Swiss-Prot record:
This is Glutamine--tRNA ligase. Keywords: Acetylation, Aminoacyl-tRNA synthetase, ATP-binding, Cytoplasm, Ligase, Nucleotide-binding, Phosphoprotein, Protein biosynthesis. Monomer. Part of a multisubunit complex that groups tRNA ligases for Arg (RARS1), Asp (DARS1), Gln (QARS1), Ile (IARS1), Leu (LARS1), Lys (KARS1), Met (MARS1) the bifunctional ligase for Glu and Pro (EPRS1) and the auxiliary subunits AIMP1/p43, AIMP2/p38 and EEF1E1/p18. Interacts with RARS1. Part of a complex composed of RARS1, QARS1 and AIMP1. Coiled coil: none annotated. GO terms for cellular component: aminoacyl-tRNA synthetase multienzyme complex; cytosol. The modification N6-acetyllysine is found at residue 309. The modification Phosphoserine is found at residues 70, 495. Pfam families: tRNA-synt_1c, tRNA-synt_1c_C, tRNA-synt_1c_C2, tRNA_synt_1c_R1, tRNA_synt_1c_R2. L-glutamine binds at residues 303, 438. It comes from Mus musculus (Mouse). ATP binds at residues 271-273, 277-283, 457, 486-487, 494-496. GO terms for molecular function: ATP binding; glutamine-tRNA ligase activity; protein kinase binding; protein kinase inhibitor activity; RNA binding. GO terms for biological process: brain development; glutaminyl-tRNA aminoacylation; negative regulation of apoptotic process; negative regulation of apoptotic signaling pathway; negative regulation of DNA-templated transcription; negative regulation of stress-activated MAPK cascade.
Length: 775
């Protein structure tokens, strides 16, 4: 609860009562503001005026480096910094000059200290600006953009008071144009504005709300918003809030720039213990996209520090997926490339008293408040001998670890740097029986590769302190770690452990089952890489976690396939139709456009014979209101043929079911136009078609409230339907795995790798957009 004294102090500084109460809820901010006010009061020896108070509040709200706060408070209290513009310049200066001492002469020059802008100077600058635009002003009068005059005058007088400039602009414009007339009060027509808004909508950033995305596809870097727009330039790591500066920082950054030439460097560092999923696609796009947008480079680095969980197939699959998405790594590296250097640095930490060998068991280190290690203060000479013994295999797994002496953001004390593992490594064999942890490896590999922007998902925020601490403890270049929100999808699970459970339960076939959202599964289902990249771009990069609807990803898929997938015709539930008056003694060759909306993309031929097959759902014995397809007394057109068929006879099987139809045909232009045209096949290929739906029935299958029985109890029994006797036109006969088609009126389909000579297997990628008028 706010104390009366504190509330009075903050309102006395110029804060509204609501703002003061809000500030008091933030203990760190209110403490800093109280300290700043106390210092200012000591300097002034009197009550702090509101203008000074507002600047003090602005200062403590924006400055995270408390070392410089006292320095700037003294300038504010002494009225050397007395405008918001000067304060912004001062904050930028101290961020750009992190090392003491500050060059006060240079600082004051950059912040306009002592600069006095007279009313005469303001009058002269405004007059010069108005003279420059006088003809346009006289023509447009008060419809002229007065902000332009303000901006140019302020540019000429950087430290002038903004209100004084505005008053002078208003006065001189009034003197030039006179009072506003009736015509000046008429609002501008909105036509031009509407056109501008229409253009803006086509290029503006998409807005993500409640899992919905609006707007057109832009590149991922055009979608960057929020904190990502404030990334530091290479070599200016110290400008990042929270970045730790040591006496060695500036020299190390100078060396870093000499090595990189100021180049942006990012990395995508997956663990090779599973298959990449849709969330990784965002990480790939962000890391590779940011580097590409800034003419930089991106490493693909495998974090191979867990030998018992790593398999060769995962290395291959990860690399394949990165390149499938269209990215080429600058270099493929492995954490194991640096094992020798990492070990040498671990020894250095022990020498410096910053790491020790501990014998607590894994179970003792778990939980929120594990007991402190009784070996934390053992002599470093002893830890050196024990660490060497660990390396030589003299401890069993779990008997000894190397721990670093620090406390992380989440309160975790002394994270493990090395542990004993006797599993042979896929690259180093049995050279090592101790392996570094993620907390130890990650930042040091970034340092070795001179990464400028270490982009991680939000769960790694708790490890940022160990990231900075370790680089600084070893006096090596320290990159900047920046965390962003993960991308999740409804109706999906992406956890490696849970996917393994799905496979073990027989719910899916493997990691690439098209019902999953692993990248290999999406590729098998037929999702184009461009669509996945577009989806990531639409979602954008924010600090907040994002959970999206699958239909938004599917919309991106349709956008790409509409222009990329040639058309074909297929029938899932065939009904034989015999044309009794077929107009030719042999089949006709029908020329079908690959893309009906753009016939310049070519044609293919399909046979049209006296026997065709249509969808059983495209026939009803008796027509109904609103029904437009084939029925008794209701003819229907056959797409692309130029013919209309009309029912003559229904042939039934022994069970009474309709077995085939006998129809007559006529030219479409020889009579009344039919209500509808349907797709068909003739002399077709028999194929297998797999139809996919959501794997789970609820949006959040992992939510114990929504699904009390666990995600395995939420499986959708209709998630896969196999149509074994489907028919498809012969234009697809030479299709290869992953070739994609639009089957007219049905959806987009991709050739599955299970296809073999004699039978093609198709996966339905996505349905067509729903047509409310189709009955």
């Amino acid at each position: 609860m706010a104390t009366p004294d504190s509330l009075a102090l903050f309102t006395g500084l110029g804060l509204s009562e609501n703002k003061a109460r809000e500030t008091l809820k933030n203990e760190a901010l209110s403490t800093q503001l109280r300290e700043a006010a106390t210092q200012a009061h000591q300097i002034l020896g009197s009550t702090i005026d509101k203008a000074t108070g507002v600047l003090l509040y602005d200062l403590v709200s924006r400055l995270r480096d408390t070392r410089r706060r006292s320095f700037l408070v003294s300038y504010i209290a002494n009225k050397k910094i007395h405008t918001g513009l000067q304060l912004s310049a001062a904050l930028e200066y101290v961020r750009s000059h992190p090392q003491d001492p500050i060059d006060t002469k240079d600082f004051e020059q950059e912040c306009g200290v002592g600069v006095v802008v007279t009313p005469e100077q303001i009058e002269e600058a405004v007059e010069s600006t108005i003279n420059k635009h006088q003809l346009q002003l006289l023509a447009e009068r008060y419809r002229f953009n007065m902000g332009l005059l303000m901006g140019e005058a302020r540019a000429a007088l950087r430290w002038a008071d903004g209100k004084m400039i505005k008053n002078e602009v208003d006065m001189q414009v009034l003197h030039l144009l006179g009072p506003k007339m009736e015509a000046d009060l008429v609002k501008k027509p909105k036509v031009a504005k509407a056109r501008l808004e229409e253009t803006d909508r086509k290029t503006a950033k998409d807005v993500v709300e409640k899992g919905e995305v609006a707007g057109q596809t832009l590149s991922l870097m055009e979608q960057l918003r929020g904190e990502a727009l404030k990334f530091h330039k290479p070599g200016e790591n110290y400008k990042t809030p929270g970045y730790v500066i040591t006496p060695y920082t500036m020299d190390l950054l100078k060396q870093h720039l000499e090595i990189t030439g100021g180049q942006v460097r990012t990395r995508f560092p997956p663990e090779p213990n599973g298959i990449l999923h849709i969330g990784h696609a965002k990480a790939i796009n962000f890391n590779f996209g940011y580097a590409k947008a800034n003419n930089g480079i991106c490493f693909l680095r495998f974090d191979d520090t867990n030998p018992e969980k790593e398999e060769a197939k995962f290395f291959t699959a990860i690399y394949d997926m990165v390149t499938w998405l269209g990215y080429t790594p600058y270099k493929v590296t492995y954490a194991s490339d640096y094992f020798d250097q990492l070990y040498a640095w671990a020894v250095e930490l022990i020498h410096g008293g910053l790491a020790y060998v501990c014998h607590q068991r894994v179970e003792e280190l778990k939980g929120h408040n594990p007991l402190p290690s009784p070996w934390r203060d053992r002599p470093k000479e002893e830890s050196l001998l024990l660490f060497e013994a660990m390396r030589k295999g003299k401890f069993a797994e779990g008997e000894a670890t190397l721990r670093m002496k620090l406390v992380m953001e989440d309160g975790k004390m002394d994270p493990v740097a090395y542990r004993v593992k006797y599993t042979p490594h896929h690259r180093t064999g049995d050279k090592w029986c101790i392996y570094p942890t993620y907390d130890y490896t990650h930042c040091l590999c970034d340092s070795i590769e001179h990464i400028t922007h270490s982009l991680c998902t939000k769960e790694f925020q708790a490890r940022r302190s160990s990231y900075f601490w370790l680089c600084n403890a070893l006096k090596v270049y320290c990159p900047v770690q920046w965390e962003y929100g993960r991308l999740n999808l409804h109706y999906a699970v992406v956890s490696k452990r849970k996917i393994l459970q799905l496979v073990a339960a027989g719910a899916v076939r493997d990691w690439d089952d098209p019902r999953l959202f692993t990248l290999t599964a999406l590729r098998r289902r037929g999702f184009p890489p461009e669509a996945i990249n577009n989806f990531c771009a639409r979602v954008g990069v924010t600090v907040a976690q994002t959970t999206m609807e699958p239909h938004l990803l599917e919309a991106c898929v349709r956008d790409v396939l509409n222009d990329a997938a040639p058309r074909a015709m297929a029938v899932l539930e065939p009904l034989q139709v015999v044309i009794t008056n077929f107009p030719a003694p042999k089949p006709l060759d029908i020329r079908v456009p690959n893309f009906p909306a753009d016939e310049t993309k070519g044609f293919h031929q399909v046979p049209f014979a006296s026997t065709v097959f249509i969808e059983r759902s495209d026939f009803k014995e008796e027509s109904e209101p609103g029904y437009k397809r084939l029925a008794s007394g209701q003819p229907v057109g056959l797409r692309h043929t130029g013919y209309v068929i009309e029912l003559q006879n229904i042939v039934r099987g022994s069970s009474g079911c309709v077995e085939r139809l006998e129809v007559t045909c006529r030219r479409a232009d020889a009579g009344e136009k039919p209500k509808a045209f349907i797709h068909w096949v003739s002399q077709p290929l028999v194929c297998e078609i797999r139809l996919y739906e959501c794997l789970f029935q609820h949006k959040n299958p992992e939510d114990p409230v929504e699904v009390p029985g666990g995600f395995l109890s939420d499986l959708n029994p209709a998630s896969l339907q196999v149509v074994e006797g489907a028919l498809v036109d012969c234009s697809v006969a030479l299709a290869k795995p992953f070739d994609k088609f639009q089957f007219e009126r049905l959806g987009y389909f991709s050739v599955d790798p299970d296809s073999h000579q004699g039978q093609i297997v198709f996966n339905r990628t996505v349905t067509l957009k729903e047509d409310p008028g189709k009955i």
